């Protein structure tokens, strides 16, 4: 089966794959963040949101995986085999859990639309040749709160300039004047 855990949230595994693996905090840090911000909702018997449910499931999977890894570590005699299992879990499964935890915590913190806009922005940024892109990648916390992901299709109707604005005053000139007055 080809199951994409992000599909119902408007994202894809491919979209998250644009973010480098070292972008995601450690599982421990993500679990601490989830507990600090959302413990009450995660432990509540009430259904809060699909993101809370997905976060609960990811946390439970990680706990079970750590239980299995501990059992394997205690019962595998061969140190080389033990190291292979530990490395596999940390590298492959750990990354998937880190991505899941990050995605759902970010959606709860910033809003799903903002996170999707960030993923698209980062994907465009990383896909642009270095000579043609800004030196710094987009940062999730600095995206405007009113970010909207536009659906493909008709372009929005263009607005005509307000008749009250005099054309001789350019926005740049006004901004620079206001900066000088603030200093």
UniProtKB/Swiss-Prot annotation:
Belongs to the orthohepadnavirus core antigen family. Sequence repeats lie at residues 155-161, 162-169, 170-177. InterPro entries: Hepatitis_core, Viral_capsid_core_dom_sf_HBV. The keyword Flavoprotein does not apply. Residues 155-177 are annotated as: 3 X 8 AA repeats of S-P-R-R-R-[PR]-S-Q. Homodimerizes, then multimerizes. Interacts with cytosol exposed regions of viral L glycoprotein present in the reticulum-to-Golgi compartment. Interacts with human FLNB. Phosphorylated form interacts with host importin alpha; this interaction depends on the exposure of the NLS, which itself depends upon genome maturation and/or phosphorylation of the capsid protein. Interacts with host NUP153. Residues 136-183 are annotated as: Disordered. Self assembles to form an icosahedral capsid. Most capsids appear to be large particles with an icosahedral symmetry of T=4 and consist of 240 copies of capsid protein, though a fraction forms smaller T=3 particles consisting of 180 capsid proteins. Entering capsids are transported along microtubules to the nucleus. Phosphorylation of the capsid is thought to induce exposure of nuclear localization signal in the C-terminal portion of the capsid protein that allows binding to the nuclear pore complex via the importin (karyopherin-) alpha and beta. GO terms for molecular function: DNA binding; RNA binding; structural molecule activity. One of its GO terms (biological process) is microtubule-dependent intracellular transport of viral material towards nucleus. The modification Phosphoserine is found at residues 155, 162, 170. Its main location: virion. Pfam families: Hepatitis_core. GO terms for cellular component: host cell; host cell cytoplasm; T=4 icosahedral viral capsid. HAMAP family: HBV_HBEAG. Residues 149-176 have a biased composition (Basic residues). This is Capsid protein. Keywords: Capsid protein, Cytoplasmic inwards viral transport, DNA-binding, Host cytoplasm, Host-virus interaction, Microtubular inwards viral transport, Phosphoprotein, Repeat, RNA-binding, T=4 icosahedral capsid protein, Viral penetration into host nucleus, Virion, Virus entry into host cell. It comes from Hepatitis B virus genotype C subtype adr (isolate Japan/A4/1994). It is found in: Virion; Host cytoplasm. The keyword Repeat applies. A motif (Bipartite nuclear localization signal) lies at residues 158-175.
